[in-house]
Amino acid sequence: MAPAALWVALVVELQLWATGHTVPAKVVLTPYKPEPGNQCQISQEYYDKKAQMCCAKCPPGQYAKHFCNKTSDTVCADCAAGMFTQVWNHLHTCLSCSSSCSDDQVETHNCTKKQNRVCACNADSYCALKLHSGNCRQCMKLSKCGPGFGVARSRTSNGNVICSACAPGTFSDTTSSTDVCRPHRICSILAIPGNASTDAVCASESPTPSAVPRTIYVSQPEPTRSQPMDQEPGPSQTPHIPVSLGSTPIIEPSITGGISLPIGLIVGLTTLGLLMLGLANCFILVQRKKKPSCLQRETMVPHLPDDKSQDAIGLEQQHLLTTAPSSSSSSLESSASAGDRRAPPGGHPQARVTAEAQGSQEACAGSRSSDSSHGSHGTHVNVTCIVNVCSSSDHSSQCSSQASTTVGDPDANPSGSPKDEQVPFSQEECPSQSQWETTETLQNHDKPFPLGVPDVGMKPNQPGWYDQIAVKVP
C-alpha cells in the first residue's frame, strides 16, 4: 500500500511541474523575497521592511525575541508570568495582564500566556465603562424598582435594568432590581381590591382565622307601625336575631355613643348659660328696688339780716290773712308764736329757716297724709315742702324725728306739737353737706332766691316773697 501511495504522489507532482506550478511539500521558515506586487503567502507571515523579506510571525503565548534578516528567520520565545500574547504577532515583548478585579467585579478568566485576565461586574451592578478588550473599567449599582413598578425586561449583559409602572391587574410590592409586576389574586368574594402596589384581599381570608363556630346577635329595627296606647314599653323594642357563623370570620361593626357626647355637652352649656343669665337679671331687679324713690336735698336758703327776718315774719302773717281768709286764724297765730319763740335772742333769722326745714321733712309722705286727712273733720292746709337731704343713716333718723306735721287739725293741742320743742339749728344741719354747698349758700346771701311755678308773678322786691318759699296756701 505504501509504494502505491508514493507512486500516486509522484504522478501528481509531475503533472503540476509540467504545467509550471510547483507547490513545496512544507512551509519554509527561511525568509523569502516576495514577487513584485505580491504580499506574503499566508497570514502567519509578515513583511519586514528592513530586510525586505517575508518572515514568520510568533504564535500566541510567544513574542519575537530576534527579528528576521536576509539569512535567518524570526526567533520566538515564550511570554513571562503575568504577560501574554493572544494572537500571532511579531512583537518584541509580551503584553501585561490586566490588574486584579475590584470589589464590585468578579474575575471570569485568569491571566495566562495566551489570554488576558477578564473581570465582569457583580450581579447587582452593571458596566458603565467598557474597554475594547472586553473588560469593564467601572461598574455601578443596578437601578431598583420600587412598589408599583417592575422590571420591564431582563437585564442584558453588563446593562442596567429598566423600570416601568405596573399595568392594571398587576402589582409589585417590593423594591428590587429583578422583580417584575405580578398579576392580582383572583377572589371569589373580593374584600379589598388590589392596586399597583398591593395585592387583592379576598373575603374568605383573615390574618387570624377562627374555625370555631360562634353566634352573634344582629340588631334589626322594627318597621314603623301604630301601637295601642295602653302598651307598656318593654326593656328593649329591638329584636335580636341569633346568627350562627362558621369558620369564615366577619367584621362586626361596633356602635358607639360618640354622637351622644357632643349633644349632652351642648345641652349642659346651654342650661348653664340660661341659669347665669337668670341670676344676672334677678340681681339687677334687686338693685333697682333698693334705690330710694325720693331723693332729698337740703335747700340752700340765703342768709338774711335781723331786720329783714322780722319784716319777713310780719309780711308772712299778713299775706296768709289776705290770701287765705278761710284758713284758721289760730293756726296762723300758732305759727307766728312758734316763730317768735324759736327766734334767737339776737333776732337771727336762722331759726325761721330751721322751722321751715323741719316742716319740709314730710315731702315723701305728704301725699299719703293729705289723702288720709280728707276723711277727718276740720280745716286742712296744703303745704309745699322744701326737701332736706340727709345722706347718713344716723342723721336721716335724726332729721325725721325733728320733722313736724304741717297738715292737720288746727284744733289739736299745740303743746304736743313738735313746734314747741327748741331744736338747735346745728342739729338740723346734715353733716353730709359738703363744703362747696356751704360756700355756695354764703355766696348767695345777696342773690334773689329762685322762685317756684306759683311765684312767677311775684317779684323779689314785693312784700312777702320770702314767706311764700316756706309755706304756700292755695
Curated annotation (Swiss-Prot):
Sugar-modified residues: 30, 69, 110, 195, 208, 224
Q: Which residues form the signal peptide?
A: 1-22
Q: Which residues cross the membrane?
A: 259-288
Bias (Polar residues) ranges:
220-239, 429-442
Q: Which stretches face the Extracellular side?
A: 23-258
- Keyword annotations from UniProtKB, A to Z: Disulfide bond, Glycoprotein, Membrane, Phosphoprotein, Receptor, Repeat, Signal, Transmembrane, Transmembrane helix
Annotated region described as Disordered, given as residue ranges: 220-241, 321-378, 397-464
Q: The organism sits in which domain of life?
A: Eukaryota
| Assembly behavior | Binds to TRAF2. Interacts with BMX. Interacts (activated form) with XPNPEP3.
Q: What does this protein do?
A: Receptor with high affinity for TNFSF2/TNF-alpha and approximately 5-fold lower affinity for homotrimeric TNFSF1/lymphotoxin-alpha. The TRAF1/TRAF2 complex recruits the apoptotic suppressors BIRC2 and BIRC3 to TNFRSF1B/TNFR2.
This chain belongs to which protein, by name? Tumor necrosis factor receptor superfamily member 1B
- Top-down, what is the taxonomic lineage of the species of origin? Eukaryota, Metazoa, Chordata, Craniata, Vertebrata
Q: Which gene encodes it?
A: Tnfrsf1b
